[in-house]
């Protein structure tokens, strides 16, 4: 699940929060990409 910390406003920075649960094995690496990069 990915969501914004605050309501987005075009042209302004914000923080994306990624929440992963019930994933096994518990040690994983998650990478967020913009346009596949």
UniProtKB/Swiss-Prot annotation:
This is Beta-2-microglobulin. GO terms for cellular component: extracellular region; MHC class I protein complex. Belongs to the beta-2-microglobulin family. One of its GO terms (biological process) is antigen processing and presentation of peptide antigen via MHC class I. Pfam families: C1-set (PF07654). It is found in: Secreted. It comes from the Eukaryota. Residues 11-37 form the Ig-like C1-type domain. Component of the class I major histocompatibility complex (MHC). Involved in the presentation of peptide antigens to the immune system. Keywords: Immunity, Immunoglobulin domain, MHC I, Secreted. InterPro entries: Ig-like_dom_sf (IPR036179), Ig-like_fold (IPR013783), Ig_C1-set (IPR003597). Heterodimer of an alpha chain and a beta chain. Beta-2-microglobulin is the beta-chain of major histocompatibility complex class I molecules.
């Amino acid at each position: 699940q990915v969501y914004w910390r605050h309501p987005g406003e075009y042209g302004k920075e914000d923080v994306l929060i990624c929440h992963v649960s019930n994933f096994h094995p518990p040690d994983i690496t998650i990478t967020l990409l913009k346009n596949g990069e």
